[in-house]
């Protein structure tokens, strides 16, 4: 099945078919706490546009990508965070499990390097 035609859990959240712990929403994106948190603070910012991953982004998505990062930063600042890790997995081998572009924001503990 084509990944673009699959209805992901994130699309169901966007469509309000399933609930989420929403932190922010506008006409371009939605942000919510990750239900499988990997840090004390772990939220996701996802575009409402159905983009599978960074691999499928086109030049016209540049402003949207910047907006996603800006929104995540705004949320982090509203939580008084001064340190966080930003992660985008692209493809199954990188750890992407939901094939709808999403940015992880993680904080609240010391992050190790390398992450993989």
Regions inferred by a protein language model and the residue ranges of each:
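HIT superfamily nucleotide-processing domains
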Residues: 1-116
